[in-house]
Design a protein with these regions (language model features):
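Short, amphipathic, aromatic/basic-enriched membrane-interface segments that mark the entry/exit
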Residues: 49-59
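Hydrophobic, membrane-inserted alpha-helices
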Residues: 63-73
Length: 177
């Protein structure tokens, strides 16, 4: 992507975080489309947690995860790519995991995992793509890091989350236990 001479700690941190979160997002998107019940199964699951229309949102979430994951791995428009992680994982946190408590091993899976991905994605936005990124190779890195990068991630990822939840999420009634 670019010369690694002069790569410092924050650049390595960005690279490691971008790659692992990017691979995780690609795996999520792939599983939503081609794993288990495929996109129809993902759509049914979205409907079951109150995100409607399920098929549209399953396709959008899968597309955002696949594209955002690849962009993170490459370090391309890094804050925008990180915003896809914030958006998809924050929706999952609110719509599915929050009610189950913090720990992921709890029945129904708690929110610790998706919260961690949201926070790490925010950190990636603040770090920017780093020295080893397409952002750096294309001369975009200085404009897409620090407070500006964090603002993009929080603004787009958080804003998209709020918009989706307000307009498309109708939580199913909780069953009496």
């Amino acid at each position: 992507m670019c010369d690694t001479q002069g790569v410092e700690g924050p650049d390595l941190a960005s690279l490691l975080l971008r790659v692992i979160v990017g691979v995780t997002l690609v795996a999520h998107g792939y599983n939503h489309v081609w794993g288990g019940g495929g996109l129809p199964g993902t759509a049914r699951w979205f409907e079951s947690i109150g995100i409607r229309p399920g098929r549209l949102h399953a396709a959008l979430a899968s597309g955002f995860e696949l594209a955002g994951g690849v962009m993170l791995i490459l370090g391309l428009l890094t804050p925008l790519a990180a915003a896809t992680a914030v958006g998809t994982m924050a929706v999952a946190l609110v719509a599915n995991h929050w009610r189950n408590g913090f720990f992921i091993f709890r029945p129904g899976e708690g929110y610790e995992y998706v919260l961690m991905l949201v926070i790490v994605a925010c950190a990636i936005g603040a770090l920017g793509g780093g020295q080893v990124s397409l952002d750096r190779a294309l001369g975009l890195a200085d404009d897409l890091e620090g407070w500006a990068g964090l603002a993009v991630v929080v603004g787009l990822g958080g804003g998209g989350t709020v918009l989706l939840l307000v307009t498309c999420w109708r939580p199913p009634p909780r069953s009496a236990t």
